[in-house]
Regions:
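Class I (Rossmann-like) S-adenosyl-L-methionine-dependent methyltransferase catalytic domain
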Residues: 1-102, 119-130, 134, 139-198
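Short catalytic micro-motifs in class I SAM-dependent methyltransferases
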Residues: 114-118
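Conserved acidic functional residues
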Residues: 55, 112-113
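A short acidic, Gly/Pro-enriched loop at the edge of an enzyme's catalytic core
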Residues: 102-110
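Polar/charged side chains located within well-ordered beta-strands of beta-rich proteins
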Residues: 111-112, 192
């Protein structure tokens, strides 16, 4: 799957927001559970691959200051509109997980509901470095990706538990790991990790 800005912009231009396969129509249930339980404390949040902005809007509603980035300008506009329609303000801008437009050690919590798993393998270490760079010491990172238990090869890459451990163990400590499925119409099988910056 490509991570070209032009390709993603075309997807958003050619697909109604409700028909986007990753548009669950609301915040990710695992994110909501962790925030409501206080596992993820309120602070400065970064929503990577914000898309329609449902997770960002949820975080704003629960007291977070939110920066939402997406590689598609149309997605950024959509997220900004969804926040505005809810009477909320977040800072939304075009951005790339491989070169996050945020200063060092600025973020308390980073959320990624399905951006990392579209990266080509050579780009993944750079993305890990960028997420680590923008987080404050002991900052939290919630990652959700397609798991190797999801059949087929279309769409995002599938990950094994070992691949995820190998990618993140040098810079993050895994606090929680669980299997599940993405919310939305297709419900693909997922792995989720809540990590803390080392």
């Amino acid at each position: 799957m490509s991570f070209d800005a032009h390709d993603w912009e075309n997807v958003y231009l050619q697909t109604a927001p409700a028909a986007l396969p990753w548009n669950a129509g609301g915040p990710d249930p695992d994110l909501a559970r962790l925030v409501k339980a206080g596992t993820i404390p309120v602070g400065q949040a970064l929503d990577i691959g914000t898309g329609p902005g449902h997770d960002a809007v949820f975080l704003i509603q629960h007291g977070f200051n939110v920066i939402g980035i997406d590689i598609s300008p149309t997605a950024v506009t959509l997220a900004r509109e969804n926040a505005s329609n809810a009477g909320l303000f977040g800072f939304f801008q075009q951005g790339d997980i491989r070169q996050i437009p945020v200063e060092d050690h600025f973020i308390d919590f980073t959320n990624d509901r399905g951006c990392f798993h579209v990266l080509e393998p050579p780009d993944r270490p750079q993305a890990v470095d960028e997420i680590h760079r923008v987080l404050k010491p002991r900052g939290l990172f919630l990652l959700r990706v397609f798991s190797d238990k999801e059949p087929g090869t279309d769409g995002p890459y599938r990950f094994t538990r070992q691949e995820l451990d190998d990618l993140f163990r040098g810079k993050f400590t895994t606090l929680q790991f669980w299997e599940g499925e993405f919310a939305g119409p297709r419900k693909p099988k997922s792995y989720s990790m809540l990590m803390e910056k080392k």
